[in-house]
A protein has these predicted regions:
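Acidic/polar low-complexity segments and flexible, solvent-exposed patches
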Residues: 1-100
Length: 100
């Protein structure tokens, strides 16, 4: 994963899954980012799902994030759906050196 990608509002689409309409960005063959910036907010990487079959579990992850007060946004990189959300602890943050 690379660093940060700034989301341009004109690139946002809507993805409907599991009764939810979700903000979605199609990046195609670009390396995924650890963080997306959109409308002044930081959306940190949360989880990735395979393109085939994501519909079976996506809504559950999104509803859980929303119930905990996080705003999700989805992005497609290569053949995977990446879930990003506001207010989550970034991967590897808060761990002491050498912990894994």
């Amino acid at each position: 994963m690379q660093g940060v990608i700034e989301v341009r509002p004109e690139n946002l689409e809507t993805l409907s899954s599991g009764g939810l309409d979700l903000s979605y960005i199609e990046y195609g063959q670009v390396q995924p980012a650890i963080k997306l910036l959109y409308a002044g907010e930081e959306y940190w990487y949360f989880k990735t799902l395979p393109l085939k079959g994501y519909g079976a579990v996506l809504a559950g992850y999104i509803r859980d994030l929303q119930a905990r007060g996080h705003k999700p946004i989805l992005a497609r990189f290569f053949n995977r759906i990446y879930i990003y959300a506001t207010g989550i602890t970034p991967i590897g943050a808060g761990k002491p050196p050498g912990a894994g």
